[in-house]
Amino acid sequence: MAYMCTDSGNLMAIAQQLIKQKQQQQSQHQQQEEQEQEPNPWPNPSFGFTLPGSGFSDPFQVTNDPGFHFPHLEHHQNAAVASEEFDSDEWMESLINGGDASQTNPDFPIYGHDPFVSFPSRLSAPSYLNRVNKDDSASQQLPPPPASTAIWSPSPPSPQHPPPPPPQPDFDLNQPIFKAIHDYARKPETKPDTLIRIKESVSESGDPIQRVGYYFAEALSHKETESPSSSSSSSLEDFILSYKTLNDACPYSKFAHLTANQAILEATNQSNNIHIVDFGIFQGIQWSALLQALATRSSGKPTRIRISGIPAPSLGDSPGPSLIATGNRLRDFAAILDLNFEFYPVLTPIQLLNGSSFRVDPDEVLVVNFMLELYKLLDETATTVGTALRLARSLNPRIVTLGEYEVSLNRVEFANRVKNSLRFYSAVFESLEPNLDRDSKERLRVERVLFGRRIMDLVRSDDDNNKPGTRFGLMEEKEQWRVLMEKAGFEPVKPSNYAVSQAKLLLWNYNYSTLYSLVESEPGFISLAWNNVPLLTVSSWR
């Protein structure tokens, strides 16, 4: 249920755009016929260039009236006649008060999901997914960046906007609050009064350092007393609205989906039958944008697109209803695009999956996607992750896309885990500053409902009852993922210049802070960073 808003809003936004485009084309055609009947004394000018138009509509854009109902649609060929308006307020209320099949699932949790998962944005940026850098015209419109560029950040904003604060130096544990938290994490039994002093110095409505310190102090306090987290009382409405606020304010999920989808498009550019195996699917938000791009690619529409969805661990023990709802939404959207689409939910536990669990036809080009989910299988032994990667390798994929958070929390002792997470979350909390006021209720909700719970979980992961092989969900840095991918038999695929340029355009067009930057690193990683702290990394493998 929590992800229905994510998926349906985006799908409907794209569908509505396509419908409006069709209506505009029909209107233009009708006007042209009328002009032919009445002589025009003024000849039409002839331009030697083409204007960018509806061919590159935005897979992330959401209008003021989203919803996932296709009124008057008895068949996808009649999509252009759907003219009923969609009311965003009524739609949001229906999400909170109603729901899809996943809401009735008692195993579907409110918490435990990714803090950067995609949510519809009111901002708008053009989609360049359907323009693979193969032809000369595309390269003229968007020149590739210099190969030597390793770190890039958007140009300074226009003068009417206040300049952002200057970049800060590398993470400094000498910040009094952070140093006190780290010292307490090292030897809590010898510093019983430290936690009290920390609580007196932090605030959930202060500056980013005080706000991060507040949630770590709360987590350490709950760990010591073994009391339940107060954030667990947040409502489903808070959860939904928090994701929306985050995605409006920050580019995390947009960057991850855009970069991975571009790699998939380039790897399957001439393929007619495409099969995507998605490890850890929620509501399929990533695939709405890809379907749109495939429907308009220069080499023509694929003959068939199939997605095999392996449920995300956070969907609980009964993910079937949620997967069925996801498949139905994607099928309806594919019909709007006139695409031959199939969706297969894979309900076998991941530990029991093998090659026979998937229907793979000989003429298919297969793609495997791990998007912000593989770390949830990661424990200190990496056994389950290794099993999943070897399974993916056995399917002989054309490309494997991997997106992960950029912080080492797994194979480190508790004090270093706290130190690394302080660096990570201080950057995340700071990244909310440009677009969310400190006294904003929306910001407080995002930090409490999304990040506060994550901090609580990573602190509690060091409990004595966590036996080896039972502690999951702690993130790793890209170098460890490189080791795991290469151990499973994969080799890296360097992102194309076009993919990098496209990620830069995302930051440009959304007018994000200049403290966001892209960092390219060997052998083929591209990371989104805030103030020189990488937060999210996407890579491709084969």
From Swiss-Prot:
One of its GO terms (cellular component) is nucleus. This is Scarecrow-like protein 7. The gene is SCL7. The lineage of its organism: Eukaryota, Viridiplantae, Streptophyta, Embryophyta, Tracheophyta. It comes from Arabidopsis thaliana. Homodimer. Expressed in leaves, sepals, filaments of stamen, and in the central cylinder of the elongation zone in root. GO terms for molecular function: DNA-binding transcription factor activity; transcription cis-regulatory region binding. Keywords: DNA-binding, Nucleus, Stress response, Transcription, Transcription regulation. It holds the Pfam family GRAS. Its main location: nucleus.
